[in-house]
Regions:
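Acidic donor-binding segment of Leloir-type glycosyltransferases
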Residues: 1-38
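Active-site donor/metal-binding and catalytic loop motifs
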Residues: 69, 177-179, 184-202, 216-217
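Active-site acidic Asp-centered loop
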Residues: 12, 61-63, 158
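Conserved donor NDP-sugar-binding/catalytic core segment of glycosyltransferases
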Residues: 65-110
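Glycine-rich, basic loop-to-helix element that forms the pyrophosphate-binding segment
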Residues: 36-53
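Short aromatic/hydrophobic "clamp" motif used to bind/position activated sugar donors
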Residues: 58
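C-terminal, non-catalytic tails of nucleotide-sugar-dependent glycosyltransferases
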Residues: 86, 96-97, 108-136, 145, ...
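A short, conserved alpha-helix in the catalytic core of glycosyltransferases
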Residues: 72-76, 135-155, 160-190
Length: 270
């Protein structure tokens, strides 16, 4: 497995006991430990880590990600090395499960959503979207690899997006700069989602913060407001599974029926 890396842990509020454990762990593994007590701000924590990083590539990895295969980093790095590549993401499954938690982000009518969320990865979906390498408008920063100069070119994470949509904003900036964000479906990890910070929809306060951050995202990226250049306009705009838009599919069926009648063919359209 890939060995040429450094580890940087950014901690925003551990107690003294856990701080000591982290410090000892970092000492044993030649890792860097950054402690700054503050209210949770994912963007600021990532940017702090970058300030201490010396590599040519940055991997942002949540503390609730579990590694379950050996070649994941090499595969992501190989993709990130391509000149047109922006952010590289992974397929994330729920722990000890084949249910999909993340397989790319689509930006549809309801806002940015995880494609195939909750779907069983045992099945193959829309043109192998959960099997092959595909471009998406965004990927989650729970596991995101990017070349350092590209990250710095677009200004890193927006620290005004403290909790949600900071990764989407980063990816939108990459798209606007001409890069392509990608999900590598041959990189599969477990994600113990929101184990540390909790659910974004747990109460009214969190919901209001979530809506404010979405509003900021679309204010910054007006051309990408509920528009996804990597998502076919003939697909439904309010679901996550790449099904045909009802009105389009009805038109398509009628055209097929018309052709069948013209050529005197029999059969059923499903």
């Amino acid at each position: 497995s890939y060995q040429n890396y450094e580890i940087i842990i950014v901690d925003n509020g551990s107690n003294d006991e856990n701080k000591s454990k982290y410090a000892e762990l970092c000492k044993k593994n030649s890792a860097k430990y950054i402690y700054e007590k503050m209210e949770f701000n994912f963007s600021k924590m990532c940017n702090l880590g970058v300030q201490k990083a010396s590599g040519e590539y940055y991997l942002f990895l949540n503390d609730d990600i579990e590694i379950i295969n050996n070649e994941w980093l090499e595969r992501m790095l190989g993709q990130a090395m391509l000149p047109h590549s922006g952010a590289v993401g992974a397929k994330l499954l729920y722990p000890n499960s084949t249910k999909i938690q993340h397989d790319g982000i689509i930006n549809i009518e309801n806002g940015p959503c995880h494609a195939f969320l909750g779907y069983d990865d045992k099945n193959i979906y829309y043109f192998g979207r959960n099997r092959l390498t595909y471009n998406y408008v965004a990927v989650t920063a729970a596991c995101l690899l990017i070349r350092a100069d590209k990250f710095n070119q677009i200004g890193g994470f927006d620290e005004d997006l403290r909790v949600a949509y900071n990764d989407v904003d980063l990816c939108f900036k990459l798209v606007e700069a001409g890069y392509y964000n990608t999900v590598r479906n041959d990189v599969i990890l477990y994600h113990h989602e929101s184990l540390s910070r909790g659910d974004d929809t747990a109460n009214k306060e969190k919901m209001e913060r979530l809506m404010r951050e979405q509003a900021r995202l679309y204010e910054k990226h007006k051309k990408l407001a509920k528009y996804d250049p990597f998502y076919n306009i003939n697909l439904t705009q309010n679901a996550i599974y790449f099904s045909l838009n009802r009105s389009y599919s009805e038109v398509l069926c009628n055209e097929v029926k018309k052709s069948m009648k013209e050529y005197k063919l029999s059969g059923s359209i499903i």
